[in-house]
């Protein structure tokens, strides 16, 4: 079996171990920190279809907001996991840096807001975390206060590798596709393909959730991603799901052999450790992405000839 692409690396250092038990407290803290930064981007950027103005993006040293407009200036915010800093850079000479170290979410939140004000950037965000159980307002969260720099660098190394594979996978589709982006609510890296057809209207009982989900899933999609944990699976895994999922989607044969369908989640999963241990992790991951996409596209009767690169 040959590597998927020569520009992608199968080196073990690019696919390090990352078990949740080893960094659970840091994960919970970093999740809140990324939500603070992500909400700043959300507040100051124009809304895009499918909430594409929400995510962060993998950068050479961590996660970045990309450019955020602010009056006659622009700025960005980057978690630099290589230097253990949150960097805030403006289009004028001003900048600020906050240390990434063991500290409470409340302290981090206050320092981020103070740093923005020092750069003449005023912004207010809803300070309640999302997509977590028992949320604590950012300014009152003294519970989450851990930072294991080594674990975070391993996370960053994985994100770099996965981002590269996802971008190659994305290049093989000529239909509408999302960027490869990091959603701070669910704390996962994802890429989404679209059939071009509208999806059925959502019927979620909660009206707020229904509005959010209707925008996210206004059109038929097949989405793949990676998360370091999930409420159902407390370990890192790759996933793929279809919305709407056509009849027979869950019964399709996918690759590699270790991949499986999780009925509670309604997703195909491939545990990260199965990829990491493979001789060619990039090839194994690409097999999962391609075969699960084909499972959704075939059962969903997508126009594959028109949508896929020749």
Question: Predicted regions: what is each one?
Answer:
Residues 2-27, 111, 117-122, 231-232:
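Phosphate-end processing signature that detects enzymes handling 5′-triphosphorylated RNA
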Residues 14, 84-97, 130-150, 236-238, ...:
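Glycine-rich, often proline-containing surface loops adjacent to acidic residues and nearby aromatics
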Residues 57-135:
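Long, hydrophobic/aromatic-enriched structural stretches that serve as scaffold segments
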Residues 2-3, 8, 260-310:
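TerminUS-proximal long segments
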Residues 140-227:
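Aromatic/basic-lined ligand-recognition segments
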Residues 9-74:
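N-terminal ordered "arm"
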Residues 67-69, 249-255, 280-284:
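Short conserved micro-motifs at the rims of enzyme active sites and ligand-binding pockets
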Residues 214, 219-271:
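Low-complexity, glycine/alanine/valine/leucine- and proline-rich hydrophobic stretches
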């Amino acid at each position: 079996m040959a590597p998927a692409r020569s520009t992608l690396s199968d080196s073990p250092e690019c696919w390090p171990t990352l078990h949740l038990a080893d960094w659970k407290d840091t994960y919970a803290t970093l999740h809140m920190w990324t939500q603070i930064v992500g909400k700043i981007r959300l507040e100051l950027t124009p809304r895009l279809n499918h909430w594409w103005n929400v995510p962060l993006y993998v950068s050479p040293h961590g996660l970045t907001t990309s450019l955020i407009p602010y009056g006659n200036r622009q700025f960005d915010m980057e978690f630099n996991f290589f230097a253990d800093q949150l960097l805030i850079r403006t289009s004028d000479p001003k900048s600020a840096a906050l240390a990434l170290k063991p500290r409470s979410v409340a302290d981090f939140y206050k320092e981020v807001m103070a740093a923005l004000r020092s750069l003449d950037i005023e912004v207010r965000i809803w300070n309640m975390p999302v997509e977590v159980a028992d949320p604590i307002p950012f300014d009152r969260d003294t519970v989450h206060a851990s930072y294991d720099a080594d674990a975070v660098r391993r996370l960053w190394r994985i994100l770099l590798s996965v981002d590269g594979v996802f971008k190659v996978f994305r290049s093989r589709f000529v239909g509408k596709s999302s960027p490869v982006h990091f959603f701070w609510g669910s704390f996962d890296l994802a890429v989404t393909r679209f059939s071009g057809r509208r999806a059925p209207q959502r019927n979620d009982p909660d009206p707020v959730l229904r509005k959010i989900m209707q925008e996210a899933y206004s059109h038929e999609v097949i989405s793949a991603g990676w998360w370091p944990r999930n409420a159902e699976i407390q370990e890192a895994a790759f996933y793929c799901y279809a919305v709407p999922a056509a009849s027979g989607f869950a019964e399709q044969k996918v690759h590699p052999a270790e991949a499986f369908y999780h009925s509670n989640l309604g997703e195909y999963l491939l545990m990260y450790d199965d990829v990491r241990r493979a001789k060619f992790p990039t090839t194994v991951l690409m097999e999962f992405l391609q075969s699960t996409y084909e499972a959704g596209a075939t059962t969903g009767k997508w126009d594959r000839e028109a949508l896929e690169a020749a």
